[in-house]
């Protein structure tokens, strides 16, 4: 006692008093707890000695710090513990004066109290007096659990039966005179958290019998709606009537609502402390973020795709092997940002595919074949069009490549890159299967131009039916014919398509006129009177129009079909004139 200077008395109870003292050498404040032994029962004396021994053995950052203890003149048990400048939680609730604590602060406090209880329960210690006046707040707003005067050390499967504690925080099994275990502390902590949340006791009554009835029936008022449903449900789970249905401290620390705060508390706590839940969570976290270097290549690719959507911290544990052809997860994350920004734009599919392919080539390793970035998509040969998907296999998203579209699939509504695809399937296999159906690589070269021309009926199927000239904007790029295109293939293809439509609908005058137009186009004398490029564009425009009309007919969208075919009536312009008008529109767009 000579080492301490008494400053003031800060508390007084039935069994003793609490004094604020300062260590004369350290100049640090402590709390001296003096428990009177004179004129006390043997049970009270044993309890005082037990508290002195127990608090000297426990070591946890969220339990009051033990400094010293002794028995003074056989009349007092003196225990020196750390001083918490914030006072106890009961005083903090009074100071709040109706202003609710934030959910974040309550979650942090709850995590710290659960860690303290989990430490005690793992060492077979029951606190038995968890209440707001025994929860202390340190200067940094962290929590300390104190007052082990009623604590009990259990054997492995032992239960307590003594009716001790504060009535408002007693669990139903204790009031029913049923042996109780560690779940009684969970109930008491639930009462404390309820009081800290609602700023009122969980159970309150005018007499003892009414209080017992409320506790045994677990009747509590609703918590403030200011807090989330998950947090309120967490508190209610701690106040379940049956102890078997109440979660343990370790189970509560694994609750998704508290997991972020468990990690925050672990980072701030001292690494020398023995905290079982924090150590376990840290171990699990490290296991999740560690990549073994000897896994097979397919598993590594799946891991890289999964981690590219996670946080940046996962990348530091990545260990790509030197023989791996794909980029590492670090590059995958960087490229995910740029790819997502490109695909988020509503652009033509060929332009989006060209941009995404170019970015994949930049980050590709030297062992993979490179494709020049400056080449436009419509000048690729059939073999070159297969290379970009190989380099972009490990990308998070992919855009539909336009050069893989055959003429019989022009009306498929999947040509724009405005919506990112959620699948991770590589587009290479699909591209190979489509190209195997083509006899000539010239048709594949011609595919991007056909894709842009067919954009006019495609937009009509996705949006309400609009005039044709609204769809022919300069954003679709040039529609001029490359010099190396085999025109005979295009002309024959157009004739076959039109004849098929004519066979299906022989009484249609527009079908006969279209067939006659294609027959006239095959005549050399007729072909000399028309520009070859205009004829080709008109034929393909009519092809797209007929295919879209067939699609509307198949979908029984007769009203839209009538609007579309209205210009082809007997009193309207002929199909030939309409085709010429379409050709002029394409020429104006190209110029």
From Swiss-Prot:
<feature type="compositionally biased region" description="Polar residues">
    <location>
        <begin position="391"/>
        <end position="408"/>
    </location>
</feature>
<feature type="binding site">
    <location>
        <position position="33"/>
    </location>
    <ligand>
        <name>ATP</name>
    </ligand>
</feature>
<keyword id="KW-0418">Kinase</keyword>
<dbReference type="GO" id="GO:0005524">
    <property type="term" value="F:ATP binding"/>
</dbReference>
<feature type="region of interest" description="Disordered">
    <location>
        <begin position="500"/>
        <end position="534"/>
    </location>
</feature>
<comment type="similarity">
    <text>Belongs to the protein kinase superfamily. NEK Ser/Thr protein kinase family. NIMA subfamily.</text>
</comment>
<dbReference type="InterPro" id="IPR011009">
    <property type="entry name" value="Kinase-like_dom_sf"/>
</dbReference>
<dbReference type="InterPro" id="IPR000719">
    <property type="entry name" value="Prot_kinase_dom"/>
</dbReference>
<protein>
    <recommendedName>
        <fullName>Serine/threonine-protein kinase Nek2</fullName>
        <ecNumber>2.7.11.1</ecNumber>
    </recommendedName>
</protein>
<keyword id="KW-0723">Serine/threonine-protein kinase</keyword>
<feature type="domain" description="Protein kinase">
    <location>
        <begin position="4"/>
        <end position="258"/>
    </location>
</feature>
<dbReference type="Pfam" id="PF00069">
    <property type="entry name" value="Pkinase"/>
</dbReference>
<feature type="compositionally biased region" description="Polar residues">
    <location>
        <begin position="504"/>
        <end position="534"/>
    </location>
</feature>
<dbReference type="InterPro" id="IPR017441">
    <property type="entry name" value="Protein_kinase_ATP_BS"/>
</dbReference>
<dbReference type="InterPro" id="IPR008271">
    <property type="entry name" value="Ser/Thr_kinase_AS"/>
</dbReference>
<feature type="binding site">
    <location>
        <begin position="10"/>
        <end position="18"/>
    </location>
    <ligand>
        <name>ATP</name>
    </ligand>
</feature>
<keyword id="KW-0547">Nucleotide-binding</keyword>
<comment type="function">
    <text>May be involved in plant development processes.</text>
</comment>
<feature type="active site" description="Proton acceptor">
    <location>
        <position position="129"/>
    </location>
</feature>
<keyword id="KW-0067">ATP-binding</keyword>
<feature type="region of interest" description="Disordered">
    <location>
        <begin position="387"/>
        <end position="408"/>
    </location>
</feature>
<dbReference type="GO" id="GO:0004674">
    <property type="term" value="F:protein serine/threonine kinase activity"/>
</dbReference>
<dbReference type="InterPro" id="IPR050660">
    <property type="entry name" value="NEK_Ser/Thr_kinase"/>
</dbReference>
<feature type="region of interest" description="Disordered">
    <location>
        <begin position="309"/>
        <end position="331"/>
    </location>
</feature>
<dbReference type="GO" id="GO:0106310">
    <property type="term" value="F:protein serine kinase activity"/>
</dbReference>
<keyword id="KW-0808">Transferase</keyword>
């Amino acid at each position: 006692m000579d080492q301490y200077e008494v400053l003031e008395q800060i508390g007084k109870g039935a069994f003793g008093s609490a004094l604020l003292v300062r260590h004369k050498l350290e100049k640090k404040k402590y709390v001296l707890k003096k428990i009177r032994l004179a004129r006390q029962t043997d049970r009270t004396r044993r309890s005082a000695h037990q508290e002195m021994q127990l608090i000297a053995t426990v070591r946890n950052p969220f339990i009051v710090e033990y400094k010293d203890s002794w028995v003074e003149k056989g009349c007092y048990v003196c225990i020196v513990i750390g001083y918490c400048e914030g006072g106890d939680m009961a005083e903090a609730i009074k100071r709040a004066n109706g202003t609710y604590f934030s959910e974040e602060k309550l979650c942090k406090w709850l995590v710290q109290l659960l860690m303290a209880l989990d430490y005690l329960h793992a060492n077979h210690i029951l606190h038995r007096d968890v209440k707001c006046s025994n929860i202390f707040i340190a200067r940094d707003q962290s929590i300390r659990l104190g007052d082990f005067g009623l604590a009990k050390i259990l054997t492995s499967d032992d239960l307590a039966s003594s009716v001790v504690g504060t009535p408002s925080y007693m669990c139903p099994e204790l009031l029913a005179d049923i042996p109780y275990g560690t779940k009684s502390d969970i109930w008491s902590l639930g009462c404390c958290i309820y009081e800290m949340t609602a700023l009122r006791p969980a159970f309150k009554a005018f007499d003892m019998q009414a209080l017992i009835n409320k506790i045994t029936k677990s009747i509590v008022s609703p918590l403030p709606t200011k807090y989330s449903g998950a947090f309120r449900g967490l508190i209610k789970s701690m106040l379940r009537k049956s102890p078997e249905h109440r979660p343990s401290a370790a189970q509560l620390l694994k609750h998704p609502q508290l997991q972020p705060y468990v990690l925050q508390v672990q980072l701030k706590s001292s690494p020398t402390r023995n905290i079982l839940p924090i150590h376990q969570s840290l171990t699990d976290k490290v296991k999740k973020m560690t990549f073994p270097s000897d896994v097979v290549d397919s598993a590594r690719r799946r891991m890289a795709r999964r981690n590219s959507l996670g946080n940046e911290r996962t990348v530091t544990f990545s260990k790509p092997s030197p023989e791996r052809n794909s980029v590492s997860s670090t590059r995958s994350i960087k490229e995910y940002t740029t790819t997502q920004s490109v695909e988020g734009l509503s652009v033509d599919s060929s332009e989006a595919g060209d941009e995404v392919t170019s970015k994949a080539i930049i980050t590709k390793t030297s062992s993979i074949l490179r494709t020049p970035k400056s080449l436009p998509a419509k000048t690729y040969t059939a073999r070159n069009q297969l290379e970009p998907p190989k380099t972009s296999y490990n990308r998070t998203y992919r855009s539909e490549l336009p050069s893989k579209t055959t003429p019989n699939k022009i009306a498929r509504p999947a040509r724009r890159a405005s919506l990112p695809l959620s699948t991770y399937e590589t587009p290479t296999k699909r591209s190979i299967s489509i190209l195997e159906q083509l006899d000539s690589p010239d048709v594949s070269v011609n595919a991007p131009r056909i894709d842009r021309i067919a954009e006019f009926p495609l937009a009509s199927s996705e949006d309400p039916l609009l005039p044709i000239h609204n769809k022919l904007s300069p954003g679709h790029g040039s529609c001029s014919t490359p010099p190396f295109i085999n025109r005979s293939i295009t002309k024959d293809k157009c004739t076959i398509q039109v004849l098929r439509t004519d066979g299906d609908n022989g009484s249609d005058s527009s079908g006969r006129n279209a067939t006659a137009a294609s027959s006239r186009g095959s005549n050399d004398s007729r072909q000399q009177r028309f520009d070859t490029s205009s004829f080709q564009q008109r034929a393909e425009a009519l092809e797209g129009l007929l295919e879209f009309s067939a699609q509307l007919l198949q979908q029984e969208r007769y009203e839209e079909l009538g609007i579309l075919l209205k210009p082809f009536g007997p009193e309207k312009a002929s199909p030939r004139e309409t085709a010429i008008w379409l050709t002029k529109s394409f020429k104006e767009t190209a110029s």
